[in-house]
Amino acid sequence: MPLPPGLAERLQDPRLHAKVMGADEAAALIAVGANVGMSGFTGAAYLKAVPQALAARLAALHAAGQTQARIGLWTGGSTGPELDGALARAQGIEMRLPYQSDPTCRQQINAGHMLYNDMHLSHVAQAVWSGLLGHLDIAVVEVAGILPGGG
């Protein structure tokens, strides 16, 4: 599959070219029940396409009777409607951390349908490294580019 225009200049490690995929394919790599780290904080660099594809998949599973089809969602802080909102509307979040400000998340947390850890942002990294929060299964990050050595 040829890379979209301009992507080869940003994705400079040719070993990664074969891994380029659409949002639905990427979302399919996220297992139900996984603890998922997603990049972003407020409006900066939070994901939009993959969370919406994941939300659609989880909503379809819920409609088919698999009501436990949810993930743990770890971010750098509050994101936006395409991430927090989409996954919350799909009832796809089992546990959310740290800070969030999405109204649908807040409603589900207050109703006891979503677990929530309002840990201060400065404590999240140490809690993850120490295993206090369980295992981070997969991370999905938005980046501007990748250099030939992977940086």
Regions found by a protein language model. Give the residues of each.
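Conserved alpha/beta enzyme-core scaffold
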Residues: M1-G151
